Amino acid sequence: MTELLKTPIHPLYAKYGAKTIDFGGWDLPVQFAGIKAEHEAVRTDAGLFDVSHMGEILVKGPDSTSYLQYLLSNDIEKIKIGKAQYNIMCYETGGTVDDLVVYKKSETEYILVVNAANTDKDFEWMVKNIRGDVSVTNVSSEYGQLALQGPNAEKILSKLTDVDLSSISFFGFVEDADVAGVKTIISRSGYTGEDGFEIYMPSADAGKVFEAILAEGVAPIGLGARDTLRLEAVLALYGQELSKDITPLEAGLNFAVKLKKEADFIGKEALIKQKEAGLNRKLVGIELIERGIPRHDYPVFLNEEQIGVVTSGTQSPTLGINIGLALIDTAYTELGQEVEVGIRNKKVKAKIVPTPFYKRAK
C-alpha cells in the first residue's frame, strides 16, 4: 500500500485534535472539533484550513500569456498583474481536465493553483500542450497554503501583518507580505462563500504561520466543513460537478468560458457546438421535501424514469435543510419541478430550487 502524502502542517494535526482520512492520496483532517461547529465558526467568525495539498504550477516565459490563452477557457489577457482569475482546463471534447485559479505575477510569469489529486495529470497535460517560449514547472512541494475564511478574517489577519488588507480586492493578491515574520503571498479568495484570504508561504514556514493564526483564537477547520461550506455556496468540486465527462457549460460555469475570445483554446470548438445544439443536461440545486440526504451518484427520477444524478449533497448546517446539486435532463430543470432521489432502496421527494443555497451579506 502506498504511503499517504502529508502536508507540512501534518505534524501539528494531533496537537489540535484532528481526525484524518485518505483524501485523494493525502492524509488530511476531516474534522477537528466537529463538522457543524467548524462550519458555523466560518459562517459567523473565522476558521483556518490547511490547503497545502493543493498543487502549484509555475508558467514563465515571453509566450506565457498566449500559451495560457490556448490552454484555458477564460480570457487570460484580461488579468492584470496582482490579480487572479478562475479558469477551466478542457479536453478537446469539452470535458474538464481541471478547474483552477491563475495568479498573474508579471507579464511573463503566472502561478496556476490546481486541485491536489489532479496536480500530476494537469502538469503532464500542460507539458504535452506546451506552445512557444515558455517553461512549465511543478513547484507544489515548495509551497504551504492556508485559507483563513469568515467574516472576521480580515480583522484577525491584520493583527499578524502590516499589509493594508482592506486594499486587496476580491481575487487580488500581494506578494512579499510579512505574516508572523514569514514572507507570504496573500490572496483575497477562498472556497467557502465567505470573505477570506488564501496565504502561500515556503513549506518550511507553514507550521509557524498556522500556529500564529490559531493563537488569535481561530478554529482549525477540516475537509468535512470545507465541503458543506462550498456546497452551500455552490462552488464546484472536481470529480463531482466537473469531470472529463462533464463540461463547464453543463456545470453552469459559463462566466469562466469565453467562447468569443480570439484565441482558440483546447475544447473551444466542442463547447461552441454544445452551446449551439443546446445542453442536454445541466446542474441544478435540489432541496429534499421528505427525509433523507442526497449523496454523490444517487439517481434522480421523474415518473419512474431516471432523469439525472446527484453530484453532491449534504444536510446544510446553515439552513437546516437537506440540499444537493444534480446534473439532470434540461427538460426538467424548471424551478419548483418536483423530482425523486433514489436513496438506498427508496425514492424520496425533492424539488428544484434556486442557487446558491447560501449567499453572504455584502
UniProtKB/Swiss-Prot annotation:
Pfam families xrefs: GCV_T (PF01571), GCV_T_C (PF08669)
Broadest EC class? transferase
Q: Name one GO molecular function term.
A: transaminase activity
Q: Name one GO cellular component term.
A: glycine cleavage complex
Q: Which GO biological-process labels does this protein carry?
A: glycine decarboxylation via glycine cleavage system
> Which InterPro entries would you find in this protein's record?
GCS_T, GCS_T_bac, GCST_C, GCV_T_N, GcvT/YgfZ/DmdA, GcvT/YgfZ_C, TrmE/GcvT_dom1
Subunit info here reads:
The glycine cleavage system is composed of four proteins: P, T, L and H.
Task: Supply the HAMAP family for this chain.
Answer: GcvT
Name of this chain's protein: Aminomethyltransferase
Species of origin reads Listeria monocytogenes serovar 1/2a (strain ATCC BAA-679 / EGD-e)
Q: What is the lineage of its organism?
A: Bacteria, Bacillati, Bacillota, Bacilli, Bacillales
What gene name is given for the protein in this entry?
gcvT
